[in-house]
């Protein structure tokens, strides 16, 4: 069976679900069990190709005398060997399409990225910034000052040629980036409420931290209309429609060579890039304290990862348009979906000894390491105190959340148990009163009556026995 598909294939032409213990949120999957060359591990093939490549470099290629070049090439070769090992030997995750090796590759990239972050963390601030020159010589230079915010008029009457120039100036490449980003985040989280909460809370964070990072300073309509309603809102809406289609889709798979028509073969190839099966996420944060804290933790990590994007660029002197910034976003898009599925399975697992998935573990470690780099490289910026009115707002919000948590999971349960006990007592008293009015003894009266009758019977028996003895004598 294919690696990464956690199901047992039925026989050829089988039309029964593959997983008997399927959850109610999981779709039914039908598979003919075809195992082709595409799905095999190819561990020996990869080892042979890797050995040939290393042998060619060692025996046939002349080693350059450039120390810096050799160092870079040695590091890249070491990473490639590790990726080859991981792609063929690492443990499969929950996803298997388009191929399990694809997700094993991103798992290994996560390890490499975390090791890179650890290396940067252990350098001095100056050495860490200058080390990035080995990646790109244009890095390691302080970022130029930029003007953010500016004129926030939607209609600028002073500009006769184009009074809406402020709006057109905001329509840059970040608009489609926001839309695509939130479309993909919705596919990861699979919940409208959580997506909207994260979207709105991040705008509040931008308001709160604009005294630390100048690029957080935006116009009000850029925050709430362009970002929340248009870009983020439209991306979330399209993502929810895609989730609806995926949850209703029939997951029935056949081997490519078992499909008779060319149109069917092309359709099968296209559907190779869709999920093998589908699980609808039901987070249910208010169902228990455990799930409530877990959902709050997920939202916190999401917001922290978003903030790290901006703070890392600031402390490591990376321009927003640099390709490393884009590569980091692509990385999180690929690993985020796997991590969310593993977290959901971890929360939904009924076993007493649960284990967090490997990709979720790495994503959490990466997010924390990025935060530590920001704290070490620019503590002055992070320690700039919040304005008083902003700190008051966050304090009030925290108190409200804490109060609701205590009421929902502690006081409410105690109150409900107390009311239920009172209700049962009242019903018992009412039933006893009704029985007494009807002339029937209540439960306690029955017990008392039985005890009296037994005592009387015992007394009468004793008297009868005494009388019988007297008569005999």
UniProtKB/Swiss-Prot annotation:
**EC number(s)?**
2.7.8.29
Task: Give the matching PANTHER family.
Answer: PHOSPHATIDYLINOSITOL SYNTHASE, PHOSPHATIDYLSERINE SYNTHASE 2
- Give the Lumenal membrane side ranges: 62-74, 126-291, 335-354, 403-473
- Region Disordered, residue ranges: 1-25, 422-473
Knockout: what is the outcome? Null mice exhibit a reduction of more than 95% in serine exchange in testis and approximately 90% reduction in brain and liver. Testis weight is reduced and some animals are infertile. Elimination of either Pss1 or Pss2, but not both, is compatible with mouse viability. Mice can tolerate as little as 10% serine-exchange activity and are viable with small amounts of phosphatidylserine and phosphatidylethanolamine content.
Q: Which residues cross the membrane?
A: 41-61, 75-95, 105-125, 292-312, 314-334, 355-375, 382-402
Q: How does it sit in the membrane?
A: Multi-pass membrane protein
Specify whether Lyase is a keyword of the entry: no
Post-translational modification Phosphoserine, affected residues:
12, 14, 16
Query: What is catalysed by this protein?
Result: a 1,2-diacyl-sn-glycero-3-phosphoethanolamine + L-serine = a 1,2-diacyl-sn-glycero-3-phospho-L-serine + ethanolamine; 1-hexadecanoyl-2-(9Z-octadecenoyl)-sn-glycero-3-phosphoethanolamine + L-serine = 1-hexadecanoyl-2-(9Z-octadecenoyl)-sn-glycero-3-phospho-L-serine + ethanolamine; 1-hexadecanoyl-2-(4Z,7Z,10Z,13Z,16Z,19Z-docosahexaenoyl)-sn-glycero-3-phosphoethanolamine + L-serine = 1-hexadecanoyl-2-(4Z,7Z,10Z,13Z,16Z,19Z-docosahexaenoyl)-sn-glycero-3-phosphoserine + ethanolamine; 1-octadecanoyl-2-(5Z,8Z,11Z,14Z)-eicosatetraenoyl-sn-glycero-3-phosphoethanolamine + L-serine = 1-octadecanoyl-2-(5Z,8Z,11Z,14Z)-eicosatetraenoyl-sn-glycero-3-phosphoserine + ethanolamine
Cytoplasmic-side positions: 1-40, 96-104, 313, 376-381
Q: How is its activity regulated?
A: Almost complete inhibition by ethanolamine in both the mitochondria-associated membrane (MAM) and endoplasmic reticulum (ER) per se.
The record's similarity note reads: Belongs to the phosphatidyl serine synthase family.
As for subcellular location, the record says: Endoplasmic reticulum membrane; Membrane
Q: What is its main location?
A: endoplasmic reticulum
Ordered alphabetically, the record's keywords are: Endoplasmic reticulum, Glycoprotein, Lipid biosynthesis, Lipid metabolism, Membrane, Phospholipid biosynthesis, Phospholipid metabolism, Phosphoprotein, Transferase, Transmembrane, Transmembrane helix
Q: Which residues are glycosylated?
A: 159
The name this protein carries in UniProt is Phosphatidylserine synthase 2
Gene Ontology terms, MF aspect: CDP-diacylglycerol-serine O-phosphatidyltransferase activity; L-serine-phosphatidylethanolamine phosphatidyltransferase activity
Gene Ontology, cellular component aspect: endoplasmic reticulum membrane; membrane
Q: In which tissues is it expressed?
A: Highly expressed in testis. Detected at lower levels in kidney and heart.
